[in-house]
Curated annotation (Swiss-Prot):
MF annotations from Gene Ontology: ATP binding; glutaminyl-tRNA synthase (glutamine-hydrolyzing) activity
Top EC category: ligase
One biological process term in Gene Ontology: translation
Assembly and oligomerization: Heterotrimer of A, B and C subunits.
GO cellular component: glutamyl-tRNA(Gln) amidotransferase complex
Protein name per the record: Glutamyl-tRNA(Gln) amidotransferase subunit A
Catalytic activity from the UniProt record: L-glutamyl-tRNA(Gln) + L-glutamine + ATP + H2O = L-glutaminyl-tRNA(Gln) + L-glutamate + ADP + phosphate + H(+)
Enzyme Commission numbers on file: 6.3.5.7
Intrachain S-S bonds: none
Organism of provenance: Streptococcus pneumoniae serotype 4 (strain ATCC BAA-334 / TIGR4)
Active site residues according to the UniProt entry: 77, 152, 176
SUPFAM superfamilies linked: Amidase signature (AS) enzymes
Superkingdom as given in the UniProt entry: Bacteria
Amino acid sequence: MTFNNKTIEELHNLLVSKEISATELTQATLENIKSREEALNSFVTIAEEQALVQAKAIDEAGIDADNVLSGIPLAVKDNISTDGILTTAASKMLYNYEPIFDATAVANAKTKGMIVVGKTNMDEFAMGGSGETSHYGATKNAWNHSKVPGGSSSGSAAAVASGQVRLSLGSDTGGSIRQPAAFNGIVGLKPTYGTVSRFGLIAFGSSLDQIGPFAPTVKENALLLNAIASEDAKDSTSAPVRIADFTSKIGQDIKGMKIALPKEYLGEGIDPEVKETILNAAKHFEKLGAIVEEVSLPHSKYGVAVYYIIASSEASSNLQRFDGIRYGYRAEDATNLDEIYVNSRSQGFGEEVKRRIMLGTFSLSSGYYDAYYKKAGQVRTLIIQDFEKVFADYDLILGPTAPSVAYDLDSLNHDPVAMYLADLLTIPVNLAGLPGISIPAGFSQGLPVGLQLIGPKYSEETIYQAAAAFEATTDYHKQQPVIFGGDN
């Protein structure tokens, strides 16, 4: 059996009734991964041995009937630490790095009985929006293998969309969960900053990074967030979890809910078919009883510029630790200490990572700090204030997740600015530390279109409520790419 069309709750019932074992489900999942891997390249490491050991232990202990995730396989983005499983951040720099600890999010998932089946491919050090900067080769879109899957959580999204796994973890610094979720037609949530511990996440932009869940449906996404969210003394930016159950509002109607539609999110640079899809979605929300009104987020247009100064500056600092001395790649042609540093970093990092390190170092350098980094911080505050003004009167914000559907592989690699602009609609959410979700809302040119819902801090349950109401009255989430295959 493949089980790839079974929901988490259906799988849980099969496990509790002992119609299948955790080992059988894990073996089937591993076969799903292997059978699709040549077409997608969505995994860096398939952790077969470790997964089967975990599954056997769960079978021996018995499935927890009160825990819907007990015995359920999970794929983890390759920048999230996993004890005893290679964690490379898809970089030559960390080609041989095997952590001796689990990230808190992974540890939380394991505590719930989840089984880590592998580490998913990604843009190197989470720097990229197409899944093409990986040292291990580009990931392919689940719907069309000549298209990008989005990034940086490319493998995590493609793996869920293709039926390799039901659930996966990604990280989102400027849209890296939501954009690949949109491009692959699944549900991806970037939680409020601090909701999921960053301990064990290989840092890119520390004021922006957040771990979050991928799933085929809204409820399954919320169930995974339930498992991984926690306050953590090991992460000074983590916050108390204010919601006992993120599924609590799923199934409730949205009559009277006020939803804002920013005019800037449907302006210049938005594909006409994407715009039409989002406007149709807005009408659908109105049919469900919500009140949808146009608003303005005037400083959102500066989001990309602000982000690439702040994120690159934080990256240039965070990546200083990779020097060829302590762990990771060390150049063999170095004859002195300076050459070890220079050659190891030059050879170990890919072009996009080096570009961002240089941009960040420049922004922080003497004479340019005030003009760039300090100014970016000031404009970031204006972006936050724009959101606060809107959320004083509205429950949620609605818009497209990305300006277009997935584009051709290798079409923007030589135009980094064009690729950066693809994050135009997701970046402001990270700058403000807000929660945002992408859900399937239609198709254009045979490819999925993602709808983004944004809420004020700690409003994930309201986001899930609205997303689930849309999902329950549409069938976009039920449509699957050819590679998904049948179920038996």
